Each structure stands twice: as C-alpha cells, then as structure tokens.
C-alpha cells in the first residue's frame, strides 16, 4: 500500500478518534457504549496491566504534574528546530521575504509569553478570606448554581459559576476547566491569557504550515516536477500525479513533509478548538457550564422524567449581556478589593 494512503488513513483515524471523544462527552448513549467497550477490554487485558495503565492515566490526568508542559515544549521545540534547520534556509535560497519567514518566530515569542502567564497566574482561587466577596460577583440562577451550597471538600460557600477542581484541590471563581497542557485551572483571572495563548498557538502552527507548503510548491514549480514522468512496476509510463509527487517529496525531504503533516493536523484541531472557546467567550459561557447544560433540567427535553411535585426548571444563560460586555468581562475581570491591594 502506498505511503500516502497509510498516512492519510492514520490522520483520519486520529481525527475520528478525537471527534468521537468530543461527541461522547456530551452524548449519554455513546458514553454507555464506551463503558461497555471498556468492560469488554477489561476481560481481555491482564489485571496487572490494567492497574498499571490506570495508575499512569490517573497520574497524567488527575494529579498536578509537569508532564504535558514538558511535552508541549518538546514538540514546539522540535517543530521550530526543523523549521530553522531546513525550511528557513531553503526559503532564503529561494529569496522569499524575510518578514514572511520571521513571522513564526514572532508568534512563538508571543505564544510562550502568554503560555507562561496562563501557567503561573492565579485562576481565581476561592479562600475563606475572599469567599464573601466572590459570592456577590455573579447572580445565582437557582438551576445550575443554587444559593447556599457549600463545597464538600473546601467547606466554603460556592459562589455562582465556581467549581471545585479535583486535580488542584481548590475552588475556582468562574471555573472553565483544568488544562493539563498548562498544569493549571482556567478561571476568571487567567482565561484572557489562555485565549491569546490558544490564538497564537493556532496562528504559529498555521504559519509554519503555510511557509513549509510555500517552499515545497516553489520547489515543484521551479524544478518542473509536475511535468516529469515515471515508470511503474509493470513498466508503464505515467505523468507525475499528485500522489506520486507527494511521495517523492517525502522521500526527498522526509523531515519537512512529516513536520508539515503534523502542523497541518494541529492547525485544524487548534482552529476548531479556538472557534469553540471564542463562541463560549462571545456568549459568556464556560466550558463547565456548556458541558453541564445538558444535565440541567429543561422543559424542552421530552425524555426527562419530572417528579410529580417538581416545577420545570429551565436553564438559561443569565450572564450574557451582549458581545462587548461579555468580552470586557473576560479581558477586564473583576478583582476583589483586598486582592487588588495584594497585587499592588
């Protein structure tokens, strides 16, 4: 089987797996299928191996550690090393614009700056000292966030839109999610840095992909490779087609083509996620609220069995006040007074 077919099959499998993970997180029937599949595999895989895998997954995803930060920096370093070592030099020989070639480095610098801010900024940790102040920031909707609820772990009253992070073991104001790639919670005070981090990471991956593609296209055009012919295994003469051309480029520039495939897939994945977080920002939702929206009781859902004495409770977004106000809330978050004094 041709290399290109195998490579495309691999990419399709990865993308399909990610799509299924996203869909399963919101679809209860698919969750049941996933649990059933896990039970089947548990009967096949030895128990000692199951414990080892479970322990590893628990460490990676349910404890604070720097594994994914290191992986993030290693992957980013490998991409930019290859870009600098080969693509940048070849593009200079082709006399491409220097500003065009330096753009990925500019995006890298901005990305690392906001990556550091996202990792190190307090996301909005709720303590006994600021508990009362946070209780007055957002209105309780009495559906997803009822009043007078205490956190069973922190023993603090839970402000609206807050959540206890089981990984970090603290409650976070306007909790969005825990991101393993930055080893920190994403909350009210660092969501702005996280948005710019994702934006610049997407832009840097896309820019590296565009520059690398430009180099390969220039090479094909200048060498007239698309006009060449080749002889197949049966001795038949063929004009150079796209599949054969890509395989030829892979054999000639394997590291560049492999890096290009990686950053192209990464650009699509990050681009899709960026659109999602921008949608949440524009509608003043958090990832936690978006996910829990399916669990909130809704009179529009005919499959929900209501208790006889219960009034239908409709979850609606009471925090969205227009695009401008929503974005202002993210990029200019409210700080409790005593927290401002500490920072000053």
UniProtKB/Swiss-Prot annotation:
InterPro entries per UniProt: Palmitoyltrfase_DHHC, PFA4/ZDH16/20/ERF2-like
Keywords assigned: Acyltransferase, Cell membrane, Endoplasmic reticulum, Golgi apparatus, Lipoprotein, Membrane, Palmitate, Transferase, Transmembrane, Transmembrane helix
Gene Ontology MF terms: palmitoyltransferase activity; protein-cysteine S-palmitoyltransferase activity
Membrane topology category: Multi-pass membrane protein
Any GO CC annotation of this UniProt entry: Golgi membrane
Lumenal side: 1-2, 89-99, 214-255
Record flagged with keyword Transferase: yes
Phenotype upon changing residue 342 to A: Impaired localization to the endoplasmic reticulum
EC number: 2.3.1.225
Lineage top rank: taxon: Eukaryota
Subcellular location: Endoplasmic reticulum membrane; Golgi apparatus membrane; Cell membrane
Any matching Pfam family: DHHC
Reactions catalysed, as given in the entry: L-cysteinyl-[protein] + hexadecanoyl-CoA = S-hexadecanoyl-L-cysteinyl-[protein] + CoA
Outcome, altering residue 179 to S: Complete loss of palmitoyltransferase activity
Cytoplasmic face residues: 24-67, 121-192, 277-344
Domain DHHC positions: 149-199
Motif Di-lysine motif boundaries: 341-344
Transmembrane segments: 3-23, 68-88, 100-120, 193-213, 256-276
Active site: 179
Any GO BP: protein localization to plasma membrane
Function: Palmitoyltransferase that catalyzes the addition of palmitate onto protein substrates including the D(2) dopamine receptor DRD2, GSK3B or MAVS. Mediates GSK3B palmitoylation to prevent its AKT1-mediated phosphorylation leading to activation of the STAT3 signaling pathway. Also catalyzes MAVS palmitoylation which promotes its stabilization and activation by inhibiting 'Lys-48'- but facilitating 'Lys-63'-linked ubiquitination.
Family statement drawn from the similarity comment of this UniProt entry: Belongs to the DHHC palmitoyltransferase family.
Subunit structure: Interacts with CPT1A.
Free-text domain note: The C-terminal di-lysine motif confers endoplasmic reticulum localization.
Protein name as it appears in the record: Palmitoyltransferase ZDHHC4
Originating species: Homo sapiens (Human)
Lineage, uppermost ranks: Eukaryota, Metazoa, Chordata, Craniata, Vertebrata
């Amino acid at each position: 089987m041709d290399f290109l077919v195998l490579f495309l099959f691999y990419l399709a499998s990865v993308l399909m797996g990610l799509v299924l993970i996203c869909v399963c997180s919101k679809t209860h029937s698919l969750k049941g299928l996933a649990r059933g599949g896990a039970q089947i595999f548990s009967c096949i895989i030895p128990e000692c191996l199951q414990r080892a895998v479970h322990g590893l997954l628990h460490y990676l995803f349910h404890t604070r550690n720097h594994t994914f930060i290191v992986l993030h920096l290693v992957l980013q370093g490998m991409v930019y090393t290859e870009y600098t070592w080969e693509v940048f030099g070849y593009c200079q020989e082709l006399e491409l614009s220097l500003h065009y070639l330096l753009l990925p480095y500019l995006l890298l610098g901005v990305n690392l700056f906001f990556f550091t801010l996202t990792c190190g900024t307090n996301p909005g940790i709720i303590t006994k000292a600021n508990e009362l102040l946070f209780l007055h920031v957002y209105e309780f909707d009495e559906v997803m966030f009822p009043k007078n609820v205490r956190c069973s772990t922190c023993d603090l009253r839970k402000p609206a839109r807050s959540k206890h992070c089981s990984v970090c073991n603290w409650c976070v104001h306007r909790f969005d999610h825990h991101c393993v790639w930055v080893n920190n919670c994403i909350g009210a005070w660092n969501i702005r840095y996280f948005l710019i981090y994702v934006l610049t990471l997407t832009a840097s991956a896309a820019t590296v992909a565009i520059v690398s593609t430009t180099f390969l296209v220039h090479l094909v055009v200048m060498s007239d490779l698309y006009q060449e012919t080749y002889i197949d295994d049966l001795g038949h003469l063929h004009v150079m087609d796209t599949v054969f051309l890509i395989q030829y480029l892979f054999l000639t520039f394997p590291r560049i083509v492999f890096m290009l495939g990686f950053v192209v897939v990464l650009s699509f994945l990050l681009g899709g996620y960026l659109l999602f977080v921008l949608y949440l920002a524009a509608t003043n939702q958090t990832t936690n609220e978006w996910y829990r929206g399916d669990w909130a009781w809704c009179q529009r859902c005919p499959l929900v069995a209501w208790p006889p004495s219960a009034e239908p409770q409709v979850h609606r977004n009471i925090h969205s006040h227009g695009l401008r106000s929503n974005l202002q809330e993210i990029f200019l978050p409210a700080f409790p007074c005593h927290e401002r004094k500490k920072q000053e």
